[in-house]
């Protein structure tokens, strides 16, 4: 059995960024068995030396992401003295940026990790929102940051998607006249629920356009003004009864509606 070659990732934060970059490069060497060993929070010489000694023991390569120039230089010097192959992922780029911006860089460790955390938080929010669109998986409503409720064509899905891309886990539940909403909707904190409504005439226009797009008769009950007004009365009554905050989406851009939702839920 072939023994995998070791690559040590020394980082002043978690090492996630270095690991992603190294793994991307390793896709070009799929025939080589490799093992990555992350050594996090390397912010002083003793911590760096401890990682290097392990690399020496296993004849590994060292890849490091350290923003402190003195510590990065120390790692470089020690690797040269000890015969370790090493690569600095950060210093060359910092130097180029310094020339480009005409100023010296800050040396705050962990900022790349903070960016990664924010990125993955948004990805997780989008994945959650897609799975909980249009009344899907209502058993998980309690895990949502925001639950949007409204009759058909009140911008529930696009608004959910917009909020998700800003890091909020959103579920949306349609209200249909004559059909009871899922019981799970009444079991969650009402302070996380927002009722969406729209002007009746505007809703007629949206539904007629939808029916035409689907090749269906635009005179169907779905787009009937009396039917729509009854649906909206039912929805608004439910909002008041459950003490859910409500937002009129008529004539508003998604950004404006999203901001209003966050303000009314005290999330902004």
Curated annotation (Swiss-Prot):
Bilayer-crossing residues are none
Q: What class of enzyme is it?
A: transferase
Ligand binding (ADP): 150-157
- Residue stretches in coiled coil: none
Any keyword Transcription?
no
One molecular function GO term is: ATP binding
**What keywords sit in the KW lines?**
Kinase, Nucleotide-binding, Serine/threonine-protein kinase, Transferase
Q: Which reaction does it catalyse?
A: N(tele)-phospho-L-histidyl/L-threonyl-[pyruvate, phosphate dikinase] + ADP = N(tele)-phospho-L-histidyl/O-phospho-L-threonyl-[pyruvate, phosphate dikinase] + AMP + H(+); N(tele)-phospho-L-histidyl/O-phospho-L-threonyl-[pyruvate, phosphate dikinase] + phosphate + H(+) = N(tele)-phospho-L-histidyl/L-threonyl-[pyruvate, phosphate dikinase] + diphosphate
Specify whether Nucleus is a keyword of the entry: no
Q: What is its EC number?
A: 2.7.11.32, 2.7.4.27
Q: What does this protein do?
A: Bifunctional serine/threonine kinase and phosphorylase involved in the regulation of the pyruvate, phosphate dikinase (PPDK) by catalyzing its phosphorylation/dephosphorylation.
Tell me its family: Belongs to the pyruvate, phosphate/water dikinase regulatory protein family. PDRP subfamily.
What protein name applies here? Putative pyruvate, phosphate dikinase regulatory protein
Q: Say which species the protein is native to.
A: Syntrophotalea carbinolica (strain DSM 2380 / NBRC 103641 / GraBd1)
């Amino acid at each position: 059995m072939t023994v995998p070659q070791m690559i040590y990732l020394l980082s002043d934060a978690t090492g996630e960024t270095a690991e992603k970059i190294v793994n991307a490069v390793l896709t070009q060497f799929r025939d080589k068995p490799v093992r990555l060993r992350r050594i996090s929070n390397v912010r002083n010489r003793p911590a760096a030396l401890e990682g290097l000694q392990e690399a020496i023991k296993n004849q590994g390569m060292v890849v490091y992401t350290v923003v402190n120039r003195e510590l990065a230089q120390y790692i470089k010097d020690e690797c040269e003295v000890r015969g370790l192959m090493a690569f600095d992922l950060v210093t060359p780029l910092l130097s180029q940026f310094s020339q480009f911006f005409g100023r010296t860089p800050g040396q705050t460790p962990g900022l790349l990790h903070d960016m990664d955390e924010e990125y993955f938080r948004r990805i997780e929010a989008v994945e959650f929102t897609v799975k909980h669109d249009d009344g899907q998986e209502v058993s998980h409503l309690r895990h949502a940051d925001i639950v949007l409720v409204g009759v058909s064509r009140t911008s529930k899905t696009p608004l959910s998607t917009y909020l998700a891309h800003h890091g909020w886990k959103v579920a949306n539940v349609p209200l249909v006249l004559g059909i009871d909403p899922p019981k799970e909707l009444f079991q969650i904190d009402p302070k996380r629920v927002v009722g969406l409504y729209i002007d009746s005439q505007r809703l007629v226009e949206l539904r007629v356009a939808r029916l035409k797009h689907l090749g269906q008769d635009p005179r169907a009950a779905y787009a009937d003004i009396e039917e729509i007004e009854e649906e909206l009365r039912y929805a608004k009554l439910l909002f008041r009864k459950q003490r859910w905050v409500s937002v009129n989406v008529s004539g508003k851009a998604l950004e404006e509606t999203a901001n209003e939702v966050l303000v009314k839920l005290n999330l902004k």
